[in-house]
Amino acid sequence: MFRVGIVAALKREVRPLVKDWSVREEEVDGRRLRFFEKDNVVLVCGGIGAEAARRAAEAVIAIYAPTVIYSAGFAGALEPTLKVGEVVQPLRVVNAGDGSSANLEQGEGVLVSFGSVASAEQKAKLRVSFGAQAVDMEAAAVGRAAEARGAGFGVVKVISDEFDFSFPSMERFVDSNGQFLERRFAWFTALRPWLWPQVARLARNSNRAALALCDGLRKMIRAISASSDIPSVGAVNRR
């Protein structure tokens, strides 16, 4: 029985955790998904964005029927005090698109799910509008899937970009399945040497964040394995 399901966006975010897990591939709605399994935990990398996360969460629930689903991955800081590598487990998740929110049983602060990679200017607005400390793209969608299927829900995120970090729009580097187009990104940045310092910083931040995230996930898995309590979605408020 798989007790814990984890939905991440990209494998590079969780590679240190799943490098020695067994792998199972399934075709779901015309897409090949890879599920990483170990003991009573299953993890899937569904892709970037809300739609990719929703499909991945629904697939995990349909195939494995875990009792709790976690949204895990990278997040941007909305507060200057949050630094790269800090793990964030919010008490509330807000969907910036429709204003709906889910209150969790465990955690601290607010995470807002936004429709794109937020620029420094957008981060400032999100902080004011939602009183959030961090921003991601997938957690609200995973929470909605968990709620619809009666599964518990939790969030483990790590700061990968700080409050003042900004980069040209990343939308062009994400395909319709939520996969990051690495070659296109490499060509884009190779032809723009003024971006190289930011690219180097982004790579360092991502590596540091991935290690911290996987550390946090290991602790979460151990805690759940030792407990009979399952995090659940609390009151879900819709506008």
Where are the regions that the model predicts?
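Glycine-rich phosphate- or other oxyanion-binding loops that anchor nucleotides, phosphorylated ligands
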Residues: 3, 27-239
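Short, conserved "active-site rim" segments that organize catalytic pockets and cofactor/ligand binding
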Residues: 2-21, 41, 87
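Assembly/interface hotspot detector across virion components, adhesins/toxins, and nucleic-acid enzymes
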Residues: 21-27
